[in-house]
Amino acid sequence: MSTIFRRSRLRAFAVGALATGIAGLASAQTATPPDQDATFRAHAHTADHHAQQGLPGGMVMLHRPDDGDDRSNRTRTPIKHVILLIGENRTFDHVYATYTPPRGQQVRNLLSEGIVNADGTPGPQVAKAQQWQAQSTGKFALAPQHTAPYATLPAMNTGGAPTQAPFASAQQAQAIEPGLPDAAYGELAAGGTGLPNHVLDTRFPATLPNAPVDMHASLGYDDYANSPVHRFFQMWQQLDCDADAATLDNLSGCRNDLFPWVETSVGAGSNGKPQPANFTDQTTGEGSTAMQFLNIAHGDAPYFAELARTYALSDNFHQSVMGGTGANHIMLGYGEPIWYDDAQGHPAVPPANQIENPDAQPGTNNWYVQDGYGGGSYVDCADDNQPGVAQIRNYLHALPYDAFHGGNCRRNAYYLLNNYNPGYLGDGTPAPLGASQFTIPPTKQDNLALLLSRHRVSWKYYGEGWDNGKEDGEGGSYCNICNPFLYSEQVMTNPKLRARNQDINDLYSDIRNGTLPAVSIAKPDGLLDGHPASSKLDLYEGYVQKIVEMVKANPTLWNDTAIMVTFDEGGGYYDSGYVQPIDFFGDGTRIPLLVISKYSEGGHVVHTYYDHVSFDKFVEANWGLHERISQRSRDNLPNPVALPEDPYVPLNAPAIGNLMDMFDFRLAHQPGRDDDEALQD
């Protein structure tokens, strides 16, 4: 049994480890040494150059800018273009549970932890993933009282997975959907469950052991399956975080052991309605969906397995907000959540039915008073009197390190925690507001797009289905909540900035023509994003593959481009990895991150701690931006320092890396320049 440490003992250990010599820790870490650019990141002068991880001997690659105002080519590494591709709702263990890396590399997943065997059956250490039943009546419980472990998991449910595939034929799909390789369109015409929605999923065994569930044993990889709950307070409860349970290898005390219980007790929320009569563990339409995982060892996710073995994979990249799609895309774009404001940009009070209340309704076990996509999604997290707030704030205060900005909650601000529509339509028209609209007003908060524009670094957001702002392409499957800049008044009321929102065919054209901006964020439509129930992972693989092959077909572009492939969040699936609480909002579970470039080859697995805002930090470091998005944005956090024997847990928490560890620039060479000239300290 792990030794339990209180806050003072853990803090003393971390300080002592740092005092023994950061240089010693750095030299001992061969796979993930700490980045040494903390001084540079703290508003260093332009002329000062500090070491960036990924270059030999702490050296920095400089590229002289082109003449003119565009500073897009002034980079500190050979990377002049970065493309971020964002899928939907898969944890790291859900995808890479049984992945075995190339020789000399190590990965932390269900297989390496002994939780499952390569054939998907429970492994010798399956007890690490044991799930519990619990009791939560009255006030919201962050770590509810355990009652008993499950003897068997609740049965699987079909939920919203389609009975039939969305298209009758590959030809019909290809006539509407441009985002797949030609050979992949049959996937849109196959894989329906053959069962009604919200019934027992008889494709799975009726009796399931208390363990992660191998989907490959029951389904084909091309089959549709249900989606688990992925909302803010629900995910906090699923992780079951208690500072009293903190250990040296788990500073958060999160036990990750209430996934099915939260699914079956509250699911996606009450929307303010009473608990249904005759309530069972199937009423929420989920069962134990959260415990499902794909099996790469048996051929699932073949393209993502190939990319991992060829390029670089992170096994310590996290969703940045507990909960769902909208809030995590917002965090990527703003480095912090956004709040409900008035026309002047000041915090205001939202309609009462849109304020979260995760307390249990009287007479129920964890059925929330007010929460849901048609219910509560705002919280004034600086006010301990707000339901659910004190429990999280007290937990953060009890941790062996200080939360970012004390939790990063502005006074009197109601922050959006889940999915609401953005404040603008694609054509720049303000979206309708009101108690029944579930739309957040336009925000004046600063964001990555504005930062890049101020520094004259080119950018675009390519959202499939944009259709020149009509948002109706590909059968109306454009994801409006995924575009962080649709929430921004400064972007959407400026025609030049608004025009940088484009479509998938614009991305293809820019790749072919060599007109790609420095920073690109690309989002598939709802058909291809890999979201469980409404999509499949093989469809997202196809979306990624088409873009990767197009970039590689342009040798000039491939020479200086990095393609980063990740997800918006874990979707509520179980994951065994460490989670670092940064502030009130997260982090959440691990999600996959692949970095594809000629400087990321070799099948390396990188263990540095990252989340979505690490992308912002990469952009700022690569383009030498001596400014952060805002004073409260997470790109102000330092890069992690960790012990070589446990690179997953930052000693200087809270800390997130800048993704430079995903690259090896030692082979960088520009024709016509000596290496000694290119590499400077």
What does each model-found stretch correspond to?
Residues 2-27:
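Gram-negative bacterial Sec-dependent N-terminal signal peptides
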